[in-house]
């Protein structure tokens, strides 16, 4: 993962309305193994974070100047240090306007992954710990707590430049308890939500369920294809990459690589060719299966409490909305 440019600034700020104090670095960080390790750990933590949103830049304006500064830097009109300095001064101003915000170390990193350029921005904080020194004494130790990542964003520079129709070249962490804590950071980037990750993932899972039902697949085959979908989505999420519908279709059925993709297009589910995988939604998508004495039951977990009701004390399942194929068979019995 080549790191093209990296710099860290410090903003001191308490959530009590006091002015934010900026300590800006004057030059980029020199290449080192420590920086490579930090960025690798940051990416791993960011990719694993649930509750991210995807979007695109607002049109450049006085309220949203970040994209203009980034374009100027990419086009060679300013260097990385100057770009980061303008950006962090803007962030300082927004922090002062938000009583909920706290300061921290602001990381800007321009790096490549494969053939793609990214810009990562994160507000980092220290944690207190302990270490054992060369004399075997236990001593206090401070370290960047990359596991507790609350405010961060990643911009796919390549997609932003080359795909003018894209609405998901920015990803950012949304606030857990309401939006207010993270609103100023989203405004700093100048980002508007363009893709509903959880909603798109739910629609994909609905399309897959419909596909399995329309294909009348044996239970074992349906279970294997479900596992393929979940494994692929989880893998893409871990890498911070979107799911490609054509690629997923090829994995689901190697003999008919376009079958699932054509099902999605023909039924007009309204899915984009690439969609972000929402981990929380995926975790709800697993199958309950059981077989005994000529009876075989298999259904997806998200149907429990909706189309399927389970009475534990009576040991019964109530199924609503039976498949038409099954009801037709029952009528002809």
Swiss-Prot record:
InterPro entries: Nucleoid_associated_NdpA
Molecular function GO terms recorded: double-stranded DNA binding; single-stranded RNA binding
A Pfam family reported for this protein in Swiss-Prot or TrEMBL: NA37
Chief place where the protein resides: cytoplasm
Cellular component GO terms held in the UniProt record: bacterial nucleoid; cytoplasm
Disulfide bonds: none
Keyword S-adenosyl-L-methionine: no
Keyword Nucleotidyltransferase: no
Localization per Swiss-Prot or TrEMBL: Cytoplasm, Nucleoid
Keyword annotations from UniProtKB, A to Z: Cytoplasm
Family: Belongs to the YejK family.
NCBIfam families according to UniProt: PRK00378.1
Name listed for the protein in its UniProt record: Nucleoid-associated protein Psyr_1083
Organism annotation: Pseudomonas syringae pv. syringae (strain B728a)
């Amino acid at each position: 993962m080549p790191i093209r440019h990296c710099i860290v600034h410090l903003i001191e700020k308490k959530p009590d309305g006091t002015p934010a104090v900026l300590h800006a670095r004057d030059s980029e960080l020199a290449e080192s193994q420590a920086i490579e390790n930090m960025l690798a750990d940051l990416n791993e933590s960011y990719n694993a974070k649930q509750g991210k949103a995807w979007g695109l830049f607002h049109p450049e304006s006085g309220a949203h100047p970040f994209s203009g500064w980034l374009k100027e830097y990419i086009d060679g009109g300013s260097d990385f240090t100057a770009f980061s300095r303008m950006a962090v001064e803007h962030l300082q101003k927004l922090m002062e306007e938000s009583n909920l915000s706290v300061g921290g170390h602001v990381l800007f990193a321009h790096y490549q992954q494969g053939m793609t350029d990214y810009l990562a921005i994160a507000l980092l904080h220290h944690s207190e710990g302990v270490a054992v020194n060369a004399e075997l004494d236990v001593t206090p130790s401070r370290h960047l707590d990359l596991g507790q990542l609350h405010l961060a964003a990643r911009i796919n520079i390549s997609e932003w430049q080359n795909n003018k129709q894209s609405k998901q070249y920015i990803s950012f962490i949304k606030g857990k308890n309401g939006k207010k804590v993270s609103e100023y950071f989203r405004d700093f980037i100048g980002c508007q939500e363009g893709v509903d990750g959880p909603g798109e993932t739910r629609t994909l899972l609905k399309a897959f369920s419909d596909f399995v039902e329309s294909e009348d697949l044996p239970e074992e085959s349906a279970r294997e294809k479900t596992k393929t979908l979940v494994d692929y989505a989880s893998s893409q999420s871990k890498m911070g990459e979107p799911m490609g519908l054509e690629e997923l279709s090829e994995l689901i059925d190697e003999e008919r690589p376009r079958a699932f993709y054509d099902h999605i297009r023909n039924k007009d589910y309204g899915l984009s060719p690439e969609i972000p995988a929402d981990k929380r939604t995926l975790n709800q998508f697993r199958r309950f299966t059981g077989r005994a004495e000529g009876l075989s039951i298999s259904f997806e977990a998200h149907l429990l409490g909706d189309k399927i009701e389970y009475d534990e004390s009576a040991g019964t399942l109530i199924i609503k909305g039976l498949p038409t194929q099954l009801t037709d068979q029952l009528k002809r019995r």
